[in-house]
């Protein structure tokens, strides 16, 4: 057993982002850090189809999407499948805490993104985590709010 090391539960990430540059950056940052990027999309319907067909450990999603649906609705559908969502958004939205594991406020740095994913991973394992600047953690997946 390695002391100080946690078993990583977040390995496969779906990125749902309507800003192309942000999506590209997130994909590269997380991919370079060793995460498997299942897909990157800007559309609710595509994201929903992906979570129905492929294993996903975490969705990193903006709340605003290029469709009539939004990230809150996606997180609700994902939660029903046992998949946690971390919002990455520039605005706080009512109801976000009911469906997501947390919210990372834009703009954020590469370091903040990686730290946020690490904190979410530990939070999902039930660890007590101090949120870094810009990250608000909500109740862990599966807990009732």
Question: Could you describe each region identified by the protein language model?
Answer:
Residues 27, 40-58, 66:
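Acidic, metal-coordinating helix/loop segments flanking the phosphotransfer/catalytic sites
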Residues 106:
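A Lys-centered signature of the CheY-like receiver
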Residues 1-12, 110-145:
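Non-catalytic signal-transmission and effector/linker regions of two-component phosphorelay proteins
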Residues 61-79:
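Conserved phosphotransfer microenvironments
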Residues 52-54, 77-83:
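Conserved phosphotransfer cores of two-component systems
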Residues 93-101:
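Short loop/helix-cap segments at secondary-structure boundaries that form the rim of catalytic
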Residues 19-39:
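Two-component/phosphorelay signaling modules centered on CheY-like receiver
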